[in-house]
Amino acid sequence: MKTLLTRSECFSLLIVLACLVPLCIAPSTWAEQAGAELPEAKQTTLGLYLTAREAYSKWQADPDGVTVLDVRTTEEYLYVGHAPMAWNVPLASQTYEWNAEKQHFGFQPNPAFIAQVKEFAGVSDTILVMCRSGGRSAMAVNRLAEAGFSNVYQIIDGFEGDPVKDPESVYNGQRLRNGWKNSGIPWTYQPDPER
């Protein structure tokens, strides 16, 4: 029976351990580590962050104990696509009134947002919140925190992700960098009347 490792086996084991040690002492998610580097508009009072891929893994590990909440407008949810397990409770609705200063259509806040979330989630439940790219979901996390929810994560890259920022690229301005839809994880256009 062989009990000693050869020099080559020892070296290989040392390399493997050197690669694994940083993973053991690192924060639990990349997104948590990057939290301080997030744009202010994507930061939340709870400070709980996940990427879309991390969020999907967290949901897969406990589908009955983790709720995915999509706070985009109903139109975005239906026509751009959505995570199949996501509940849609819009943080706001589109007003279709042009805001010349912001160069965008306006939004009307959803006054029933908290009450609608409480219909399927409790204040201590784990909730993973997404919007298009992380801005509205950060606002939603903060609103939920103010209402007493304590385990609410911000999906920092949202459903569509961040835009490509390369003027030389034909994809400049398109949301192709990250996000649920671009991460190779399940999404659909099919509505679920229960959600």
Predicted feature residues:
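Compositionally biased non-globular segments, especially hydrophobic aliphatic-rich helices
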Residues: T6-E9, V21, T29
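Bacterial N-terminal signal peptides
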Residues: S12-I25
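Conserved G/P- and acidic residue-centered "switch" motifs that form tight phosphate/ATP-binding loops
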Residues: G134
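Short hydrophobic beta-strand that contains or immediately precedes a catalytic carboxylate
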Residues: T67-R72
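Bacterial N-terminal signal peptides that target proteins for export
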Residues: K2-I15
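Rhodanese-like catalytic fold shared by cysteine-dependent sulfurtransferases
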Residues: K2, P27-D64, L78-T126, S137-R195
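Short, surface-exposed ligand- or partner-binding patches at beta-edge/loop junctions that are enriched
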Residues: V129-C131
